[in-house]
């Protein structure tokens, strides 16, 4: 998963 500081969740691609 990619940790995105601007989003309240982790995005898994």
From Swiss-Prot:
EC number, as in UniProt: 1.15.1.1
Transmembrane regions: none
Keyword Oxidoreductase: yes
UniProt KW Oxidoreductase keyword: yes
A molecular-function term among this protein's GO annotations: metal ion binding
Enzyme class at the top of the EC tree: oxidoreductase
Named cofactor requirement(s): Mn(2+); Fe(2+)
Alphabetically ordered keywords of this record: Antioxidant, Iron, Manganese, Metal-binding, Oxidoreductase
Bound cofactor: record note: Binds 1 Mn(2+) or Fe(2+) ion per subunit.
Swiss-Prot/TrEMBL catalytic activity: 2 superoxide + 2 H(+) = H2O2 + O2
Family the UniProt entry places it in: Belongs to the iron/manganese superoxide dismutase family.
Role: Destroys superoxide anion radicals which are normally produced within the cells and which are toxic to biological systems.
Descriptive protein name: Superoxide dismutase [Mn/Fe]
Organism: Arthrobotrys dactyloides (Nematode-trapping fungus)
Biological classification of the source: Eukaryota, Fungi, Dikarya, Ascomycota, Pezizomycotina
């Amino acid at each position: 998963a990619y940790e995105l500081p601007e989003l309240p969740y982790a995005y898994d691609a």
